[in-house]
Structures are given as structure tokens and as C-alpha cells.
A protein has these predicted regions:
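Acidic donor-diphosphate engagement hotspot in glycosyltransferases and nucleotidyltransferases
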Residues: 35, 63, 92, 116-118, ...
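Short loop->beta transition adjacent to catalytic acidic/histidine clusters or analogous donor-positioning motifs
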Residues: 16-19, 40-54, 62, 75-78
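Acceptor/aglycone-binding surface of glycosyltransferases and processive sugar-polymer synthases
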Residues: 82-98, 103-106, 115-188, 215-234, ...
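Short, well-formed alpha-helical segments that are part of the catalytic scaffolds
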Residues: 28-43
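Acidic helix N-cap motif at the loop->helix transition within catalytic regions
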Residues: 30-34, 61-70
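Hydrophobic helical membrane-anchoring modules
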Residues: 1-19, 158-161, 184-257
Length: 257
């Protein structure tokens, strides 16, 4: 079966009752319109009850104003503005708190996937409360690949989380998970924290290989030295704090609507 036919079969076979897209944005004026257009097109294939949450993390390039214009045009879109830059973790926590639908799909605003590939994740929700992507076809150079391998290995050894691609910004999950976990990260450790907390609470995590595309607009800061240092500091802080917090186990998986 071709990939295109597989997508259409998934659409017919499985949908979601409702879905919130969450896009964290900092100086993404070159990507925001595409995010909304593609989320609307793909989201309508997944559900009839859709919202798109754009989190403007104190952008300086006009991204926030453009997001507001898109919200005026499309009732599915709502925009959250930070008066001060709070980095990825702060932006995602704001977006997750603003999401109101049964399922949440977090994707980076540089759109590292073909949006319709999200349809391939929907059938996996029959047996998992969270579906995460792992990148296929990465071409970021040996330095980034080594950093990624070391980071994933650290997370596995320190926290017992065995997934292939902790930091890939494709995570589809039940919003009810957020009621049972605690997220504190303000930086890029948020991806690992979300997965670790979900795993510790007993929820099921499925993995989906996804084609990866380099950004075509805007500037990534994930590989910068300051970001890496902040991730390591937040990891150490999290490990210390986690030892003091009780673990809340997951309820029985809900019946699928």
C-alpha cells in the first residue's frame, strides 16, 4: 500500500473526538501562516472539533501581530502572548494550559514534518495515551547526531525512559495526562520532562518513525551552547526534585470514543 493510501485508510478508520494543536513561536513570522494553514487542513481530516493554539513567546519580528490577524480570520485559532521571552518550556506550558480539547498535538512551528504524516499517528492512539515521532532521514551533521545520541542515552540511563528521539517536536497525547503530571521546565528540557513524567505515571507511549525536514525559515537555537547548558542544568534540577515528589499512577485507560 502506498503511503498516500495508508494515510487515507487511517482517516477513514480512526479519528479523534477533538484536537488542540500547540505551536510555540519565537520570531517565526516566516512560518506562522503555513502552520495555521496546514494545521487546519490536516486537523479537519482528524476531527470535527479543532483548535490551534499559537504561543507568541515575545517575538520581535511581528510574528505575534500576524498570529492575531490569523485568529481574526479563523475561529479555530487562539493566540497566547508572553510579554517576556520564556523559552520553549515556558511557551509549551502556556500552550498546554490553554488547550481545551481531548487530545493535544505539539509540533515545532518550523514544521519539521509533512503535516499530513500526523494522520499516521492517529491509529496508534487506540493502544497508547501518547504517540511521539522519531526522526528519519536526518541530515544535521555529525556534531548534532552525536549530541542527540548522547542526550537520548543520558535520559535512558538516568530516568529509565527508552525512546529513540526524546527531543523531536511531535507529541500527540491525551490532555488528561497534564492533570496527572507536573511540568516545571522553562527551557528545552521540557520535551524530556513531558516524556519522563508521562512514563512515570504509567501511561503508554507509542513511537512513530516520521520523515524529517530541515527548517526553511527562521533560526533554530536548540544546538547553541547556552541552550545545551540550560538543558543539563534543568536535567540535574529535575532529578533532584523528582526524588522528593510522590508518583501518581495512571488510571485504567479510558474507553475509546
Amino acid at each position: 500500500m502506498s503511503r498516500e493510501n495508508q494515510k487515507e485508510t487511517n482517516v477513514i478508520r480512526t479519528t479523534l473526538p477533538s484536537l488542540s494543536f500547540v505551536f510555540p513561536m519565537y520570531n517565526e513570522i516566516g512560518n506562522v501562516e503555513r502552520c495555521v494553514a496546514e494545521a487546519l487542513a490536516t486537523g479537519r481530516k482528524i476531527t470535527s472539533d479543532l483548535e490551534i493554539v499559537l504561543v507568541d513567546d515575545a517575538s520581535t519580528d511581528g510574528c505575534g501581530a500576524l498570529a492575531d490577524q490569523l485568529a481574526e480570520r479563523h475561529p479555530e485559532v487562539k493566540v497566547m502572548h508572553h510579554p517576556k521571552n520564556r523559552k520553549l518550556g515556558g511557551a509549551l506550558r502556556t500552550g498546554f494550559a490553554a488547550a481545551t480539547k481531548d487530545w493535544v498535538l505539539y509540533i515545532d512551528s518550523d514544521l519539521p514534518i509533512e503535516m499530513d504524516d500526523a494522520l499516521l499517528a492517529v491509529p496508534l492512539t487506540s493502544n497508547a495515551e501518547m504517540v511521539i515521532g522519531n526522526r528519519q532521514g536526518r541530515a544535521e551533521g555529525p556534531k548534532r547526531e552525536i549530541m542527540s545520541w548522547v542526550y537520548n542515552r543520558l535520559i535512558r540511563v538516568l530516568f529509565g525512559l527508552n525512546v529513540r528521539d526524546v527531543n523531536f517536536a511531535f507529541k500527540l497525547f491525551r490532555r488528561s495526562i497534564l492533570e496527572r503530571i507536573s511540568l516545571q521546565s522553562e527551557g528545552s528540557f521540557i520535551d524530556a520532562e513531558l516524556l519522563i513524567e508521562t512514563h512515570k505515571a504509567g501511561f503508554r507511549i507509542a513511537e512513530l518513525p516520521l520523515r524529517y525536514f530541515e527548517r526553511t525559515a527562521g533560526v533554530s537555537t536548540l544546538g547553541s551552547g547556552s541552550v545545551v547548558v540550560k538543558i543539563l542544568h534543568e536535567m540535574a534540577d529535575y532529578r533532584r526534585a523528582a526524588a522528593l515528589r510522590p508518583v501518581r499512577s495512571a488510571p485504567a485507560p479510558p474507553a475509546r470514543p
